[in-house]
Curated annotation (Swiss-Prot):
Residues annotated as signal peptide: none
Name of this chain's protein: Pyridoxine/pyridoxamine 5'-phosphate oxidase
Alphabetized UniProt keyword annotations: Flavoprotein, FMN, Oxidoreductase, Pyridoxine biosynthesis
ATP-binding as UniProt keyword: no
Subunit structure as annotated in this protein's UniProt entry: Homodimer.
Basic and acidic residues: bias regions: 145-163
Amino acid sequence: MSMDSDAKSPFQTAELAFDDPFAAFSQWMEDARGAEPNDPNAMTLATASPSGVPSARIVLLRSVDAAEHPERGFVFFTNTESRKGVEIAANPQVALLFHWKSLGRQIRIEGKAIPVAVEEAESYFHTRPRISRLGARASDQSRPLPDRKTLQKRVEEEEARYPGDDIPRPAYWSGYRVTPTVIEFWQQMPFRLHDRLVFRRQGKNWGQEKLYP
């Protein structure tokens, strides 16, 4: 049986067709929230040192800016003195990757990581669970830790210092906004003949093209 007559042919499935990558992202994220059992907003963040040594880790997307935002992008929060924060300070070019296995979809983003405003970091920090806020103060993220008891002791010390809910945000805890220059949508298809649609920023607009799988 030829592929053209196969009921599972990738060419019998509607292909990706979007005009607005942010609108498409929002729709795919909504689909993922209904399909993924855990953390549909989880994304791989890739950074690189000034000498080009890459590193990657999973972080959580916290917001996507509305169209009127002057630096519209994808926002996450972290310790800015961690490895990723140090690398972003030296080289703000980063990549993000969302993968939703249940949907057979990926979105890949390239762009520049820009620190969020202090007010934005403050606002989000105070929505976090109390122990998470204490942990942010207690952890020297990415630095050597002698043992778990040391971390436990530091958290307990912060808890004693701030017994109530008024826990100040440490200056090194903030966020970044990734302003994209490239957004690629990938849809799994049979026989590895996947569908890829990439948007590239062209001034205030977006150009788009298909890519071979």
